[in-house]
Amino acid sequence: MHRGRSASARQERDFRALMDLAHGFMASQVLFAGCALRVFDAAALGPVDAAALARSSGLSPRGTRLLLDACAGLGLLRRRRGAGPRGPAYTNSPLASTFLVAGSPLSQRSLLLYLAGTTYLCWGHLADGVREGRSQYARAVGVDADDPFTAIYRSEAERLLFMRGLQETWSLCGGRVLTAFDLSPFRVICDLGGGSGALARMAARLYPGSEVTVFETPDVVAAARAHFPPPADEDGAEPRVRFLSGDFFRSPLPPADLYVLARVLHDWADAACVELLRRVRGALRPGGAVLLVESVLSPGGAGPTRTLLLSLTMLLQARGRERTEAEYRALTARAGFSRLRLRRPRGPYHAMMAARGGGAGARSDGGGGDATSQTGSGTGSEVGAQD
């Protein structure tokens, strides 16, 4: 009898765990809908009730009440005790106040909207992606493109949403990866595929003695200049960052002491990564180095779970995968770099630095591998990016 009861209790626990996994997409959609409908922005102004929010936002009263209750159940909102004539009132939880309100310094709203409108749709075709071994943009968003960024940047609105999402990611954890190593000896820094320039501007603030350049595609550079003006520091000065446009698989790369590749290599297969690293090494000055920012798998590739899921995202949205430290060490060595070192700052990303070295791996031409065009900033769905 005791064994039977234990087995039954274990089965109940396993079934609950199974249902939590099966229903996980529902929780994601509650989060996404709350952001899209600006529920958390409304609650930031004061307690909200379903009837008033529905009326002011043009929503159905029934749907609004159900969504607010679900947000409260997930810990995104707090349902106040007691109910007035229009039903219960809701306020933001600390999590929502910090990460889900559009005006918060650490808001991740744009990132979540990007996940909802692109990554979530691709994940609906995971079985197809596993069968075919290729991205699922054609099924998910109707764009059948060899270059993943053609799909991500399928409209100017989507381009800006993606760039804002990356900017939000770096606002949360950019400083940690940029201070994992002391970058002050590097006087000229180039952020390859640096998007809006958020990480580059952070580097310029942290290392005021360095000149920082963002190398991006022409369309991204134009969008960065038009829509992402540099914030002034406390003394009113703007961090000095310049933008150069080009294709990092084809165009000449500017000379630098340090190249930063943040969430870039995970987009690409090994051959393209080696080709890009060789191009970077060819542009580095003597004594230079490359800083890689990635979510690194544990030895053997068995975890962490979040990084394993990100690797599937790369199957569905790009051509690459997440890798172990040993795999990054092998890639950099094939490109001629030496002494790869890994640091694990608090947060979702790891920082790796490899020295330019003096071997024969450098090559300054832009062809080879399976690289056909520049990806720009990593597709990382960072996914928030929580550990």
UniProtKB/Swiss-Prot annotation:
Residues 354-387 are annotated as: Disordered. Pathway: Aromatic compound metabolism; melatonin biosynthesis; melatonin from serotonin: step 1/2. Keywords: Lipid metabolism, Melatonin biosynthesis, Methyltransferase, S-adenosyl-L-methionine, Transferase. The keyword Nucleotide-binding does not apply. Induction: Exhibits very subtle night/day variation, if any. This is Acetylserotonin O-methyltransferase. It catalyses: N-acetylserotonin + S-adenosyl-L-methionine = melatonin + S-adenosyl-L-homocysteine + H(+). Expressed predominantly in the pineal gland (at protein level). Very low expression, if any, in the retina. It comes from the Eukaryota. Its EC number is 2.1.1.4. InterPro entries: COMT-like, O_MeTrfase_dom, Plant_O-MeTrfase_dimerisation, SAM-dependent_MTases_sf, WH-like_DNA-bd_sf, WH_DNA-bd_sf. The active site is at residue 266. Homodimer. Belongs to the class I-like SAM-binding methyltransferase superfamily. Cation-independent O-methyltransferase family. GO terms for biological process: lipid metabolic process; male gonad development; melatonin biosynthetic process; methylation; negative regulation of male gonad development. S-adenosyl-L-methionine binds at residues 153, 170, 216, 246-248, 263.
